[in-house]
C-alpha cells in the first residue's frame, strides 16, 4: 500500500511517501519569508504548495499514484480525535474557516491529489481535538 502524507506548516511543507511501513520519500520543503510574502492570505498558498508537493514527488522519480493520501488536519469545528475521510464539504470548511493557518491546506491538497490518483483522502486528529 502506497500512502502520501502531507503536513503544511507556517514555514515548511513536509511530504512523505510510504510503501507499506517503509518510508520511500521524506522531505521538508522550507518556505522563505520572501516566498510567502507574495500571498496576502494563507488560502492563496494552495496552488503554490500543491505544486511543490507534486514536484518533490516527481523529482524523486515516484509516480503520483497512491492508495491513500493523508493531510494534516485543519482548524475545523471541535470534533473527537480520529481519522476522517476528506470530502468537498470539509475542504470548503477549512478554506473558509475564520481562523487561518497553513495546516488548513493539508486536507485540501490531500483531497486534490487523491482525486487525481483515484484514491481516498484522510485527515487524522485535526488541530481542534
Q: Which residues fall in each region the model found?
A:
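Short glycine-rich, Thr/Ser-proximal phosphate-binding strand/loop in the N-terminal lobe
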Residues: 3-44
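Short, structurally constrained coil/turn elements
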Residues: 9, 62, 115-117
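A generic structural motif
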Residues: 19-24, 64-65, 119
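Conserved active-site "lid/cap" helical segment
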Residues: 30-65, 70
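Glycine-rich anion/phosphate-binding loops
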Residues: 45-52, 98-106
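Short beta-strand-loop/turn "lid" adjacent to the catalytic site in phosphate-handling enzymes
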Residues: 57-102, 120, 128-129
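Phosphate-binding/catalytic loop of phosphoryl-transfer enzymes
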Residues: 103-107, 111-129
Amino acid at each position: 500500500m502506497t500512502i502520501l502524507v502531507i503536513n503544511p506548516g507556517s514555514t515548511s511543507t513536509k511530504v512523505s511517501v510510504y510503501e507499506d511501513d517503509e518510508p520511500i520519500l521524506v522531505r521538508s520543503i522550507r518556505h522563505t519569508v520572501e516566498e510567502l510574502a507574495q500571498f496576502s492570505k494563507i488560502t492563496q498558498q494552495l496552488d503554490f504548495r500543491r505544486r511543490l508537493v507534486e514536484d518533490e514527488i516527481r523529482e524523486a522519480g515516484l509516480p503520483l499514484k497512491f492508495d491513500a493520501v493523508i493531510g494534516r488536519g485543519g482548524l475545523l469545528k471541535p470534533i473527537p480525535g480520529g481519522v476522517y475521510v476528506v470530502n468537498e464539504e470539509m475542504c470548503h470548511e477549512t478554506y473558509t474557516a475564520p481562523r487561518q493557518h497553513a495546516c488548513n491546506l493539508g486536507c485540501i491538497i490531500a483531497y486534490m491529489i487523491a482525486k487525481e490518483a483515484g484514491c481516498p483522502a484522510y485527515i487524522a486528529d485535526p488541530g481542534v481535538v
